[in-house]
Curated annotation (Swiss-Prot):
Pfam families: DUF697
Family, similarity comment: Belongs to the UPF0283 family.
Gene Ontology cellular component terms for the protein in this record: plasma membrane
Descriptive protein name: UPF0283 membrane protein Meso_1416
Intracellular or extracellular location(s): Cell inner membrane
Main subcellular location: membrane
Its membrane topology: Multi-pass membrane protein
Residue ranges crossing the lipid bilayer per the database entry: 71-91, 105-125
Sorted UniProt keywords: Cell inner membrane, Cell membrane, Membrane, Transmembrane, Transmembrane helix
Lineage: Bacteria, Pseudomonadati, Pseudomonadota, Alphaproteobacteria, Hyphomicrobiales
Region annotated Disordered, chain positions: 1-28
Protein origin, superkingdom: Bacteria
Length: 354
C-alpha cells in the first residue's frame, strides 16, 4: 500500500499578453475611387409596393379590338360605284328623252340633275367632315392617354390645344380656356396639365351631359308607364337612345352625321359589351328591389324606372365613348347618380296619378 501524497505548492505563470504591435490592424491608406465603377445598385425585379399599388388600382381599360377584314368595305364601295353608274346612265337616258320631246324640258332636266349632284356632293363632304371629326376625337383620346402614361408635357400641351380648338364654339368653356392660357407657363407636368384641362374644359360639359341623360331616362320612364303595348315601349326606348346619342355627340364633338352616327353607335355597343350591360341590368333591378322602391311604386312605373335606368346606362356608355379625354380628374358618373333622381321623379308622378 502506497504512502499518501504530501501536499505541495505549485506556481502558475500567467499567459503572456499580446503585444500592441501584433493586435494593431493595418490601416488602409485613403484613396480616391469612382462611385459609378465601384458601386453598382441592382434594383429588385419585383417591388412589393408597386405590386400592391397595381392590385389596388382600377382595372385597365379594355384593349382595342383588332381590325376586321376589309372585304365588307370593298363590297360596299363596289356596290356604291355600281349604283352611281346606274344612276348616271338613267339620268343620261332621261335627259336625252326630254330633249327629244322639247328643248326646254331637256334643259330643265339637266339643271335638276346638276342641282341634285351638287346637293349630293355637299352631303358627302359634310358626312366626311363629321366622320373625320369623330376620328380626330378618338385619336385625341389615345394621344392624351399616351401623354398621361409617359407624363409628356409637350404632347399634353398639343392635346390641350386641339381640345381648346374643338370646344371653341362652346360658351361654357370660355372661362376654362382663359384659365389654361394663364397657367400655360406655370405647370410643367404633363399629367397635371391634362387634369387641369379636364376640370376646366370638360367638367361643365359633363354636367350638361348628365342632365341630358337624366332627362332622357325620365321621359322613357313616363312613356313606359303610360304606353299600352310593350312594342311601343321598345320603340320609344330605341328612339330616345338614338336622340340621346346624337345630342351627346353634338355636345362634345359636333354633329356626327349619318355615317358618323353609325360609327358612334358601334363604339357605344362595344363599350356596353365590354362593361357588361346585362350584369348592370341585374344590378339595377337589385338596387330598386333592395331599396324598397318597387313596393312604393306601381307595376308600370316600376317597369318605367328599370327602362329609364337602362337608358341612363346607354347614356353613360355614350359619354365614355364620345368624351375627348378619359375620366381622371373628374369623377366618372355612376348608375347611382341617376337612380335617386329617377325614383323620386317616378314616385312624384305616381302620387299625381293616384
Amino acid at each position: 500500500m502506497s504512502e499518501p501524497r504530501r501536499p505541495a505548492a505549485f506556481r502558475i505563470e500567467p499567459a503572456p499578453s499580446p503585444s500592441p504591435e501584433a493586435t494593431r490592424e493595418d490601416v488602409r491608406k485613403p484613396r480616391a475611387i469612382r462611385v459609378d465603377e465601384a458601386v453598382k445598385i441592382t434594383p429588385a425585379e419585383i417591388d412589393i409596393f408597386d405590386s400592391l399599388e397595381t392590385e389596388a388600382s382600377a382595372p385597365p381599360p379594355a384593349a382595342a379590338p383588332k381590325r376586321r377584314s376589309r372585304l365588307g368595305a370593298v363590297f360596299v364601295a363596289a356596290l356604291g360605284m355600281l349604283v352611281s353608274l346606274a344612276a348616271g346612265l338613267w339620268a343620261d337616258s332621261l335627259i336625252r328623252d326630254l330633249f327629244s320631246r322639247a328643248d326646254w324640258l331637256g334643259w330643265l332636266g339637266a339643271a335638276l340633275v346638276a342641282v341634285a349632284a351638287l346637293a349630293l356632293f355637299a352631303i358627302v363632304v359634310r358626312e366626311a367632315i363629321a366622320v373625320a371629326r369623330l376620328a380626330s376625337v378618338e385619336r385625341m383620346r389615345r394621344r392624351s392617354d399616351d401623354a398621361y402614361e409617359r407624363d409628356d408635357a409637350r404632347q399634353a400641351r398639343a392635346v390641350i390645344a386641339d381640345l381648346s380648338s374643338l370646344l371653341a364654339s362652346h360658351p361654357d368653356t370660355a372661362a376654362g380656356r382663359r384659365q389654361l392660357e394663364q397657367l400655360e407657363g406655370d405647370v410643367i407636368d404633363g399629367r397635371d396639365l391634362l387634369r387641369i384641362a379636364e376640370k376646366e374644359l370638360l367638367a361643365p360639359l359633363d354636367k350638361r351631359a348628365q342632365k341630358l341623360v337624366l332627362d332622357a331616362a325620365k321621359r322613357v320612364s313616363v312613356v313606359t308607364a303610360v304606353s299600352p303595348r310593350a312594342l311601343m315601349d321598345v320603340g320609344y326606348v330605341i328612339f330616345e337612345a338614338v336622340r340621346l346619342l346624337r345630342r351627346l355627340s353634338e355636345l362634345y364633338c359636333g354633329r356626327p352625321g349619318f355615317f358618323g352616327f353609325l360609327r358612334l353607335s358601334r363604339n357605344v355597343l362595344a363599350h356596353l359589351a365590354v362593361t357588361g350591360s346585362m350584369a348592370m341590368g341585374d344590378t339595377i333591378v337589385q338596387q330598386i328591389v333592395g331599396h324598397g322602391i318597387a313596393a312604393r311604386l306601381s307595376a308600370r312605373l316600376g317597369e318605367g324606372v328599370v327602362n329609364g335606368m337602362m337608358t341612363a346606362r346607354i347614356g353613360m356608355a355614350a359619354i365614355s365613348a364620345i368624351r375627348p379625354l378619359s375620366f381622371r380628374a373628374v369623377e366618372r358618373p355612376g348608375i347611382g347618380d341617376f337612380l335617386k333622381a329617377l325614383t323620386q321623379f317616378a314616385a312624384k308622378t305616381d302620387g299625381k296619378r293616384t
